[in-house]
């Protein structure tokens, strides 16, 4: 079972900072092979390591700058869950900026990896999100 600080580290220091660094391996190492990531408001859904890898290759490749920051985390150690509210600034290769304040809900499995990630975004998502979605 992960402690409070370990849950925050997994979400912020590994998952989000991995995205900021465009580090595909770092991001993928936070998720179980059967992880489900979904965007309820956008109908995007990625199930399993292969779909998630395709998604993150697309996402990281579509944005020259990714900046997740200003995290507020609520942790439930008993359920191995974390809610993270944050700002994210994305800049595509043409210089178009997208600024959002989003909320992710993370649920971990017994191995201390994300088994489910639920993402609530404040703006419509276009490029970087279609690949890998079923």
Locate predicted features.
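Hydrophobic pocket/interface hotspot
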Residues: 15, 26-28, 35, 48, ...
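A short gly/proline-enriched turn/hairpin at secondary-structure junctions
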Residues: 36-47, 58-62
């Amino acid at each position: 079972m992960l402690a409070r600080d370990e849950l925050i580290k997994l979400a912020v220091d590994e998952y989000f900072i991995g995205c900021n660094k465009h580090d595909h391996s770092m991001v993928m190492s936070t998720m179980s092979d059967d992880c489900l990531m979904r965007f309820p408001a956008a109908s995007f859904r990625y199930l399993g390591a292969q779909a998630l890898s395709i998604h993150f290759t697309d996402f990281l490749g579509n944005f020259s700058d990714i900046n997740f920051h200003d995290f507020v985390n609520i942790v439930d150690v008993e359920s191995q869950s974390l809610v993270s509210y944050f700002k994210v600034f994305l800049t595509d290769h043409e210089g178009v900026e997208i600024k959002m304040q989003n909320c992710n809900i993370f649920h971990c499995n017994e191995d201390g990896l994300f088994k489910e990630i639920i993402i609530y975004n404040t703006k419509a998502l276009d490029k970087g999100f279609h690949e890998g979605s079923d």
